[in-house]
Design a protein with these regions (language model features):
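Major-groove DNA-recognition helix of helix-turn-helix-type DNA-binding domains
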Residues: 21-48, 55
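Polyanion-binding surface elements
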Residues: 2-28
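Short intrinsically disordered terminal tails
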Residues: 1-5, 65-68
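A short, Lys/Arg-enriched interface patch at domain edges and termini
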Residues: 54-68
Length: 68
C-alpha cells in the first residue's frame, strides 16, 4: 500500500495491512492467516483477505480471545 492509499480505498488486504490494522507482529499475522476459520486466500505464495471478509470475521469474533 502506498502512502496515499487509505483503508477505505482497499478491497483486498495483505499481511502487512492486517498487521497494521490489528497492531500485531508479522509472526502473529502469519499464524492468523494460516488458522482455521480465518477467511484468507493465496495468490501464489502471498496471503490476502477481502475487506468484507475481514470485517465480517472481526465482527463475528468480537470479544473472543485468540492465542496466536
Amino acid at each position: 500500500m502506498n502512502a496515499t492509499t487509505t483503508n477505505a480505498e482497499l478491497i483486498i488486504y495483505t499481511i502487512e495491512d492486517v498487521m497494521r490494522i490489528l497492531r500485531i507482529s508479522r509472526n502473529q499475522a502469519y499464524k492468523l492467516f494460516n488458522s482455521d476459520g480465518f477467511p484468507s486466500f493465496r495468490i501464489g505464495s502471498s496471503h490476502r483477505i477481502t475487506k468484507s471478509a475481514f470485517e465480517k470475521w472481526v465482527n463475528s469474533n468480537e470479544g473472543r480471545k485468540f492465542l496466536i
